[in-house]
UniProtKB/Swiss-Prot annotation:
Pfam families: TAL_FSA. InterPro entries: Aldolase_TIM, TAL/FSA, Transaldolase_2, Transaldolase_AS. Belongs to the transaldolase family. Type 2 subfamily. It catalyses: D-sedoheptulose 7-phosphate + D-glyceraldehyde 3-phosphate = D-erythrose 4-phosphate + beta-D-fructose 6-phosphate. This is Transaldolase. GO terms for cellular component: cytoplasm. Pathway: Carbohydrate degradation; pentose phosphate pathway; D-glyceraldehyde 3-phosphate and beta-D-fructose 6-phosphate from D-ribose 5-phosphate and D-xylulose 5-phosphate (non-oxidative stage): step 2/3. Its main location: cytoplasm. Keywords: Cytoplasm, Pentose shunt, Schiff base, Transferase. The active site is at K144. It is found in: Cytoplasm. PROSITE patterns: TRANSALDOLASE_2.
Length: 373
């Protein structure tokens, strides 16, 4: 099967592939347009770590930084970052705009994240998300909000306001259920006010491979103790994702979701994130091949994207094995491993990692402002 056929075959099954990457040369070279035209790429995601690598790790932004500071010498480091990021993502959104229109607003999105320092402040998250969405000024822009308790609160407000939202750093089915509920409440508020539903789109970014990265060493300890855990290695991340998808399907069949769909709402799709394989013993497309299903997105880093184009498999895999997934999670508890505490830890670590990348990036921009880079 050709690369084009793989991506388009996934679309026929109801899944869209997005690109978990942004850098200015992706736009300048025409490569992004080529990926959309030739491969069928459906969207793009960014985060502070991706922008840290793009801006701090290359010289591609040197001229843009100089020009921005000449135009507005009063820019602080964070304002300078958002100016650079918005420039990139507006251009990317424009490249995706024909796809957005062709799909009736269902696909062709780009995502910009609020400051990770706001992860536990709902009001500040709402203010910044509204401001960034207005500055992006593109119908196919999404604002990324972390899936913390504060982020869930912000989500409901933002959806009701008409802001497209990508809820990120989701690790547990319980937190995802809260996110889906908040999305429904936000959409119901719009419906009650007689406002359009089809113009507001959201995804819920559920992180996958990091779950196995934490659990596999714990399972190895149990194996060394002679306990039955070998069958769970490399399985729990996919099981966790399958249970999230099962919850989505249950809710989609319910009266509230049906009412929203009838009024024009696009479903809040699950977006599989952190799908690059970190364990070299596993297939490099494990978290792509195993998570294919209708009304989902998978955002792939470049290496995983290329691997899937080369040798990925295309078949519906998400809806199967739900009872097996439940049994695997139950077996984990029998081994004395608390999945909820693991996912809570992963949420905290994810926020800290983005904060660290953000601080590093702002430090680099501070040096640039002082003429040190």
């Amino acid at each position: 099967m050709s690369a084009e056929n793989r991506i388009r075959a996934l679309r026929a099954l109801g899944q869209s592939i997005w690109y978990d990457y942004i850098r200015r040369d992706l736009l300048d070279s025409g490569e992004l347009a080529r990926l959309i035209r030739e491969d069928g790429l459906g969207g793009l995601t960014s985060n502070p770590a991706i922008f840290d690598k793009a801006i701090a790790g290359t010289d591609l932004y040197r001229t843009a930084i100089r020009d921005a500071l000449r135009a507005d010498p009063g820019l602080n480091d964070e304002a300078l970052f958002f100016r650079l990021a918005i420039e990139d993502l507006q251009r990317a959104a424009d490249v995706f705009l024909p796809l957005y229109r062709e799909t009736g607003g269902a696909d062709g999105f780009v995502s910009l994240e609020v400051s990770p320092d706001l992860a536990h402040d709902a009001e500040a998250t709402v203010r910044e998300a509204r401001a960034l969405f207005a500055r992006m000024d593109r119908p196919n822009a999404m604002i990324k909000v972390p899936g913390t308790r504060a982020g869930v609160e912000a989500l409901e407000t933002l959806i009701a306001d008409g802001v497209n939202v990508n809820v990120t750093l989701l690790f547990s089915v319980a937190r995802y259920a809260q996110v889906l509920e908040a999305w429904m409440r936000g959409m119901e508020a719009r419906l009650e006010r007689g406002e359009a539903l089809e113009t507001v789109t959201s995804v819920a970014s559920f992180f996958v491979s990091r779950v196995d990265s934490v659990l596999d060493p714990l399972l190895e300890e149990r194996i060394q103790e002679g306990r039955p855990a070998e069958h769970l290695r490399g399985r729990l991340a996919i099981a966790n994702a399958r249970l999230a998808y099962a919850h989505f399907r249950d809710q989609r069949g319910g009266a509230r979701h049906t009412r929203l769909t009838a009024a024009g709402a696009h479903p809040q799709r699950l977006l599989w994130a952190s799908t690059g394989t970190k364990n070299p013993d596993y297939s490099d497309v494990l978290y792509v091949d195993s998570l294919i299903g209708e009304h989902t997105v998978n955002t792939l880093p470049p290496a995983t994207y290329r691997a899937f184009l080369d040798h990925g498999s295309v078949a519906e895999t998400l809806a199967e094995g739900v009872e097996t997934a439940r049994a695997q999670v139950a077996a984990l508890a029998d081994l004395g491993i608390d999945l909820e505490s693991i996912t809570d830890r992963l949420e905290s670590e994810g926020i800290e990692a983005f904060q660290k990348a953000f601080r590093h990036l702002l430090g680099v921009l501070a040096e640039a402002r002082q003429g040190k880079r």
